[in-house]
Swiss-Prot record:
Keywords: Disulfide bond, Ion channel impairing toxin, Knottin, Secreted, Signal, Toxin. GO terms for cellular component: extracellular region. It comes from Cyriopagopus hainanus. Residues 1-14 form the signal peptide. Belongs to the neurotoxin 10 (Hwtx-1) family. 51 (Hntx-8) subfamily. Hntx-8 sub-subfamily. It is found in: Secreted. Disulfide bonds join C44-C57, C56-C69. This is U3-theraphotoxin-Hhn1k.
Amino acid sequence: TFAGLVLLFVVCYASESEEKEFPKEMLSSIFAVDNDFKQEERDCAGYMRECKEKLCCSGYVRSSRWKWCVLPAPWRR
């Protein structure tokens, strides 16, 4: 029975780990930018755009959690 409990723990832990990554994956796919549909190339990243290599455009800040450019707000410090 101990082996069964260990197996149950491992399965539950793996499932929980996948659930933590799901929101990030879902949001990334929703806001993903397809390069074919870009009208112009910019030197900065706009609202809800990924900002790994580019800096955020004026008026936006980089979200520490999602690594996207978002509007500045008091709770995002």
